[in-house]
Amino acid sequence: MHIWVDADACPVVIKEILFKAAQRAKVQMTLVANHTMRIPKSSYIDFLQVTQGFDIADNEIVKRLSDNDLVITADIPLAAEAIENGAIALNPRGELYTTENIRARLNMRDFMDSLRSSGVDTGGPPPLNQKDRQAFANNLDRLLTRYARQR
């Protein structure tokens, strides 16, 4: 397993959870972003900076994916591509994207996008709260525990 983080929009508090988890579980993790960011010194954590542009980071993640890799993203199309390529996708609120729920998520995203383009103010997601952080940490821990048992 390799953890791929869509790091441009990933909240700092989630990155901190990921840094600790990668180190503890001894799992390779790469943050992919189009701007520089600080990462802790660790043999398990890497940073890949890509050029600016629409979906450049997403495309780079998809290109490098292997079966059973884990992708951390709130980007539903990236999550769908990851799942299609045999990876696991988890969003920063701790929700696991699956083959069963990704189609509905894509449809809702497209519907909201069409509302926004017609001038409707749909607002954004609520701020990340403690419950979201805990759900993320719990699901990440479950996935890493399952991976450790399979090694």
Curated annotation (Swiss-Prot):
<dbReference type="InterPro" id="IPR003791">
    <property type="entry name" value="UPF0178"/>
</dbReference>
<feature type="region of interest" description="Disordered">
    <location>
        <begin position="116"/>
        <end position="135"/>
    </location>
</feature>
<dbReference type="Pfam" id="PF02639">
    <property type="entry name" value="DUF188"/>
</dbReference>
<comment type="similarity">
    <text>Belongs to the UPF0178 family.</text>
</comment>
<protein>
    <recommendedName>
        <fullName>UPF0178 protein Tcr_1995</fullName>
    </recommendedName>
</protein>
